[in-house]
């Protein structure tokens, strides 16, 4: 059971809030951080205005400015794919260095494209976790320095909360309650988001995330990093029914995921094939492997919708950019007359607009980060609790 700060506790620590429903469980601010915050930080009222979001959890350096009403004024992303491609995956030390080199320019460009000045900002939101420790520290320290210089509040938010918030960036009126699938390189989680804004964790991966399965599968197939988009492109030329890869649904009624067995099945399939067959059937291998992943994601998501009684589904995170997943979700949602939210591709992968959106909710709820806020590489979603 995750820690929960009830409204009464928040009222004592942060003053009365009119927006508790938007940020019900500030897990990442419970503990010693409360003890070191100044009285001014705890009780300072936030006057809604433009805010800057900063994201450095993995291999994208991103900054975004949201207007007073939450509209996205800019969304700048600098990718490190060229840095990590020759290693076949993210090298944490190189990621941290690249963030240091890029963060000031990315933030300045986000501000320039927004048409605002530093003096116009009223708050800063930064990814506090989960993610790579060194990468997170770059963003957290930069955000704290800006907040101190500009004399405006900062707030640390969960990367998972950012992905959840991205579902409402394009369509603020997307209905609640709904089921949210967060599917990325590091996470595969199903949540039930209540009308209050509170989330309940319905299921998660027991081993590898879907994005991890895509990346490792791409490596085995000899495709370039990042693996997800590479498999997506290759699969368009293949037959998704060519090879019967296993699909793990676990026990009946389970909303958890497991992709480790699928990776092993691909490995054994490739080992049993002559080299010329691997090359000749590369597209079929990619398409069949992809189908085994996305079919489970779709089936579990709609099972969660049925069991929860919701009539809406939001799918967010980097893997939500997969073209086959999007097509299957749209077909199923149409057939079952469900509302479906698939964020634009710019909001699927790691970005700072989603961090700013989650941070805006936190600031409206009265949350503030002290100046000794630290990165939390294992930070869970602070919107959610487990049941």
Model-derived features: positions:
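Active-site neighborhood for divalent-cation/phosphate handling
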Residues: 129, 133-135, 143, 149-178, ...
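A contiguous, well-structured pocket-lining segment that forms one wall/lid of small-molecule binding clefts
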Residues: 233-313, 322-336, 363, 383-387
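Intrinsically disordered, low-complexity segments enriched in serine/proline and basic residues
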Residues: 2-12, 24, 124
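N-terminal beta-alpha supersecondary unit
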Residues: 48-130, 159, 285
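Short glycine-rich phosphate-binding loop at a beta-alpha junction
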Residues: 118-127, 309-319
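A short helix-loop
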Residues: 38-51, 57, 64, 74, ...
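Conserved phosphate-binding/catalytic loops in two-lobed NTP-binding clefts
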Residues: 156-157, 313, 330-354
């Amino acid at each position: 059971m995750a820690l929960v700060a009830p409204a009464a506790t928040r009222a004592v620590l942060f003053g009365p809030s009119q927006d508790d429903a938007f940020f019900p469980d500030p897990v990442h601010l419970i503990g010693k951080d409360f003890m070191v915050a100044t009285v001014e930080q705890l009780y300072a009222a936030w006057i809604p205005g433009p805010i800057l979001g900063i994201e450095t959890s993995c291999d994208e350096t991103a900054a975004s400015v949201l207007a007073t009403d939450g509209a996205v004024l800019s969304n700048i992303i600098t990718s490190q794919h060229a840095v990590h491609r020759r290693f076949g995956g993210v090298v944490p030390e190189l990621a941290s260095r690249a963030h240091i080199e890029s963060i000031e320019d990315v933030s300045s460009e986000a501000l320039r494209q927004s048409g605002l000045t530093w003096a116009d900002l009223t708050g800063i939101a930064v990814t506090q976790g989960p993610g790579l420790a060194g990468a997170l520290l770059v963003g957290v320290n930069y955000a704290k320095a800006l907040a101190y210089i500009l004399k405006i509040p900062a707030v640390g938010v969960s990367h998972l909360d950012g992905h959840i918030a991205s579902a409402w960036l394009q369509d603020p009126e997307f209905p609640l309650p709904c089921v949210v699938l967060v599917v990325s390189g590091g996470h595969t989680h199903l949540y039930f988001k209540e009308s209050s804004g509170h989330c309940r964790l319905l299921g998660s991966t027991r081993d590898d995330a879907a994005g991890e399965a895509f990346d490792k599968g791409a490596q085995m197939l000899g495709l370039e990093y990042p693996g997800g988009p590479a498999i997506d492109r290759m699969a368009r030329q293949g037959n998704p029914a060519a090879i019967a890869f296993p699909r793990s649904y676990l026990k009946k009624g389970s909303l958890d995921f497991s992709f480790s067995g699928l990776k092993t099945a691909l490995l054994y399939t490739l080992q049993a094939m002559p080299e010329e067959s691997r090359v000749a059937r590369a597209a079929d291998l990619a398409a069949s492997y992809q189908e085994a992943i996305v079919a489970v994601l779709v089936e579990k998501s709609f099972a969660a919708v049925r069991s929860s009684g919701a009539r809406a589904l939001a799918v967010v995170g980097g893997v939500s950019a997969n073209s086959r997943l999007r097509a299957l979700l749209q077909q199923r949602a149409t057939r079952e007359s469900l509302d479906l939210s698939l964020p634009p591709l710019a909001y699927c992968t790691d970005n700072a607009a989603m961090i700013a959106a989650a941070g805006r909710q936190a600031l409206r709820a009265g949350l503030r980060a002290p100046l000794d806020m630290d990165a939390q590489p294992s930070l869970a979603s602070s919107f959610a609790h487990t049941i």
